[in-house]
Design a protein with these regions (language model features):
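Long, contiguous binding/interaction regions
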Residues: 42-226
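Conserved metal-phosphate-binding beta-hairpin within the catalytic cores
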Residues: 13-36, 150
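A long amphipathic alpha-helix within ATP-dependent nucleotide-binding catalytic cores
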Residues: 1-19
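Phosphate-binding loop/pocket of nucleotide- and phosphate-handling active sites
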Residues: 35, 40-43
Length: 226
């Protein structure tokens, strides 16, 4: 295990190593098979070993301008539950439908999912104006951490300011830094604005199991973030 840790420290492009199966022998533990998975990243470690540094999501904040307004981007936390609930309540029925693909009321369970997160595999970011949330973007990776799904929603009077585009680029960079190589999202065919945004950001559309939706996907590459 120490040698595997040394490899992870020395080689930034190393995504994961799988040793399977592992059996016990009279002389100790033996791995009968192994595989190595790489990601797009420099092969050599920089002086700061930056590939090993992950800032605590809850402490990262950015200040954005949107027209004449100043917004703060930060990760959602458990104590944001009521702020998030108020944000979702302010959305129109149509905006909620385009985001959640249902006309049913948004339950407290949905709100909890966005504030009680496993930061190893998911994150949700809110754009705050003072104490009020104006937009939310979320990503959630699969169990292996190789691909992730996204969702984004912006309050109506803050739409058409380029916020959704900036939020998408923010999570693209974040998930790529975590080793995720592909980002995908399910978008209703009737959501013309989101479908245009996906095209603008370089996503490719594929048919979905749901006839009223498209799956937009993008392969994330090191050159896009270097």
């Amino acid at each position: 295990l120490e040698r595997l840790a040394d490899l992870a420290e020395a080689i930034p492009t190393l995504r994961r190593i799988v040793l399977d199966p592992i059996v016990e022998t009279p002389r100790g533990t033996l791995a009968l098979s192994a595989s190595v998975h790489l990601r797009e990243a420099p092969v050599e470690c920089d002086e700061r070993a930056s590939h090993l540094t992950v800032a605590p999501a809850s402490r990262v904040e950015e200040v954005w301008s949107a027209g004449d307004r100043t917004l703060t981007l930060r990760a959602l936390r458990e104590n944001d539950f009521f702020r998030l609930e108020a944000f979702l309540d302010r959305l129109s029925d149509e905006t909620k439908f385009l985001r959640f693909h249902t006309r049913a009321p948004i339950t407290q369970a949905v709100v909890s999912e966005l504030t009680q997160l496993n930061y190893d595999l998911e994150n949700a970011w809110g754009l705050f104006e003072g104490d009020e949330i104006r937009a939310v973007v979320r990503w959630s990776a699969d169990a292996e951490g190789l691909s992730a799904e996204f969702g984004v929603v912006v309050e109506e009077r803050f739409q058409r300011l380029g916020l959704a585009s900036r939020l998408m680029r923010h999570i693209e960079a974040e998930v790529f830094s975590r080793g995720v190589g592909r980002l995908s999202g399910l978008v209703l065919r009737e959501n013309a604005g989101m479908n245009r945004l996906m095209t603008k950001l370089g996503y490719a559309a594929n048919e979905s199991d749901e006839p009223d939706s498209l799956v937009w996907s993008k392969t994330l590459r090191y050159k896009d973030f270097s």
